[in-house]
Amino acid sequence: MASSSVPPATVSAATAGPGPGFGFASKTKKKHFVQQKVKVFRAADPLVGVFLWGVAHSINELSQVPPPVMLLPDDFKASSKIKVNNHLFHRENLPSHFKFKEYCPQVFRNLRDRFGIDDQDYLVSLTRNPPSESEGSDGRFLISYDRTLVIKEVSSEDIADMHSNLSNYHQYIVKCHGNTLLPQFLGMYRVSVDNEDSYMLVMRNMFSHRLPVHRKYDLKGSLVSREASDKEKVKELPTLKDMDFLNKNQKVYIGEEEKKIFLEKLKRDVEFLVQLKIMDYSLLLGIHDIIRGSEPEEEAPVREDESEVDGDCSLTGPPALVGSYGTSPEGIGGYIHSHRPLGPGEFESFIDVYAIRSAEGAPQKEVYFMGLIDILTQYDAKKKAAHAAKTVKHGAGAEISTVHPEQYAKRFLDFITNIFA
């Protein structure tokens, strides 16, 4: 892992939008040693290398100025850019020419704060070691080395949708005090390498950074074409769907109070999505089997050329993390209390924010991870055309997934309400 500061090179930086505001009062946070150097990490993929470099540069720049007292409309249009042109610039680790852009830096800084994520922890979790690829996702999907964050490669249309809804999303997060089942959006970036633009969206991982998921479902409340393919089912951890959930007689066993709180939160979130005419979202359900999870696993032999943390991101064995509270940052997962090791099925609720443990006396000892995903699809002309085509194919009364936002929400809530025992 290489580390250095930016050398004299053709590096141009620009910030669009308002300058820094005044300091503002926020909750007490642990103190960190601010790193003055921008770290550069070796990454097999130039795109990932530039992304890591860009995030480190961005967080370092933000750390030099206090957060604004309040966000202004211009903050939701702002961006910061940097362009590097030098064939000697970190040539072992990075391409010689690249551009990096962060969208709405002050807005996402504020969102990270509201979600209880310190900027230095965010930086460490993303960049201490390169992220790993996760299989079986639409588009490119990366998981941070400590498994607390996911980096999803999205389209320029997704970025445009995020931009148009970001102000509403931020207002909603303020209103609900960050207590939501919606994705926690933490950063939005564009990376340009070899004249090709890639767009990256960083979110909190809905699954645990330490409890492996043994089964997962993507639930929409539709029964047409909602069964995992044979190709999907043979994967180590297939993404199962609505029909699979029903066919397996799967149920979620949580206490009545937890169920009440969850459904209230879900209804509130779905009402927000309906207001924005958003649909086609899913409930992502991950299930950790506590008995299975407490069984010792065979350790794989370590190769001589492996680094200290090899960044493997299979869903079956997260790396061990050392707790550190108050000095050098250990990343988002580094808050684990070192004086009390977590037992089987235990989790820190402020890290694994989507987790709910099964009720006492439930037939299965499990931990459930439940959150809303794919919330960027708005009901537009393309959706209307798809709905018309599916109606012709399946009939007007069929349980097809492409319907109006209000219909989608009602069907979705009806289905999810019935997944509980």
From Swiss-Prot:
UniProt entry keywords in alphabetical sequence: Acetylation, ATP-binding, Cytoplasm, Endoplasmic reticulum, Kinase, Lipid metabolism, Nucleotide-binding, Phosphoprotein, Transferase
CDD domains on file: PIPKc_PIP5K2C (cd17311)
Assigned EC number: 2.7.1.149
Keyword ATP-binding applies: yes
Catalytic activity: a 1,2-diacyl-sn-glycero-3-phospho-(1D-myo-inositol-5-phosphate) + ATP = a 1,2-diacyl-sn-glycero-3-phospho-(1D-myo-inositol-4,5-bisphosphate) + ADP + H(+); 1,2-dihexadecanoyl-sn-glycero-3-phospho-(1D-myo-inositol-5-phosphate) + ATP = 1,2-dihexadecanoyl-sn-glycero-3-phospho-(1D-myo-inositol-4,5-bisphosphate) + ADP + H(+); 1,2-dihexadecanoyl-sn-glycero-3-phospho-(1D-myo-inositol-5-phosphate) + GTP = 1,2-dihexadecanoyl-sn-glycero-3-phospho-(1D-myo-inositol-4,5-bisphosphate) + GDP + H(+)
InterPro entries xrefs: PInositol-4-P-4/5-kinase_C_sf, PInositol-4-P-4/5-kinase_core, PInositol-4-P-5-kinase_N, PInositol-4/5-P-5/4-kinase
Domain named PIPK: residues: 43-420
Gene Ontology cellular-component terms listed: autophagosome; cytosol; endoplasmic reticulum; extracellular exosome; intracellular membrane-bounded organelle; nucleoplasm; plasma membrane
Posttranslational modification: Phosphorylated, phosphorylation is induced by EGF.
Region Required for interaction with PIP5K1A, residue ranges: 69-75
Subcellular location: Endoplasmic reticulum; Cytoplasm
GO biological process, one term: phosphatidylinositol phosphate biosynthetic process
UniProt KW Lipid metabolism keyword: yes
N-acetylalanine: modified positions: A2
Residues recorded with modification Phosphoserine: S26, S349
GO molecular function: 1-phosphatidylinositol-4-phosphate 5-kinase activity; 1-phosphatidylinositol-5-phosphate 4-kinase activity; ATP binding; identical protein binding
Job of this protein: Phosphatidylinositol 5-phosphate 4-kinase with low enzymatic activity. May be a GTP sensor, has higher GTP-dependent kinase activity than ATP-dependent kinase activity. PIP4Ks negatively regulate insulin signaling through a catalytic-independent mechanism. They interact with PIP5Ks and suppress PIP5K-mediated PtdIns(4,5)P2 synthesis and insulin-dependent conversion to PtdIns(3,4,5)P3.
Subunit structure: Interacts with PIP5K1A; the interaction inhibits PIP5K1A kinase activity.
Name of the featured protein: Phosphatidylinositol 5-phosphate 4-kinase type-2 gamma
Gene name per UniProt: PIP4K2C
